[in-house]
């Protein structure tokens, strides 16, 4: 699961709207939260900690999701490069 899906899932489990989360974080528009949940941008690390508090989840769980997504992305990129190089030889 990537961070965007994780954030949306946890917000819904907390019973909060995007607008309510934005307001708790001090944003004037829910568009920030929407963008995070659609993977268009990522919240700053300090904001992730606040989100964890608002959703009553462990910040470590959130960072583990981010780490796994990064590892998966790097693995996919390296695999693609490996196969491209193998085809040219």
Regions found by a protein language model. Give the residues of each.
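Short basic helix-loop element that most often maps to the first helix and adjoining turn
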Residues: 5-24, 79-87
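Helix-turn-helix DNA-binding elements, focusing on the entry/boundary residues of the two helices
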Residues: 7, 18, 30, 45-48
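Residues in the recognition helix of alpha-helical DNA-binding motifs
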Residues: 10, 24, 35-36, 65
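The short coil/loop that forms the "turn" connecting the two helices of the helix-turn-helix
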Residues: 16, 27-28, 57
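DNA major-groove recognition helix of helix-turn-helix/homeodomain DNA-binding modules
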Residues: 20, 46-61
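Recognition helix of helix-turn-helix/homeodomain-like DNA-binding domains
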Residues: 26-42
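Short, charged recognition helix plus adjacent turn
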Residues: 53, 63-89
């Amino acid at each position: 699961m990537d961070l965007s899906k994780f954030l949306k899932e946890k917000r819904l489990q907390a019973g909060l709207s995007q607008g309510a989360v934005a307001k708790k974080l001090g944003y004037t528009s829910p568009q920030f939260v929407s963008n995070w949940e659609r993977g268009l941008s990522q919240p700053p690390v300090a904001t992730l900690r606040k989100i964890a508090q608002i959703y009553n989840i462990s910040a470590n769980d959130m960072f583990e999701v981010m780490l796994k997504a990064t590892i998966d992305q790097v693995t996919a990129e390296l695999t693609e490069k490996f196969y491209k190089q193998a085809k040219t030889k």
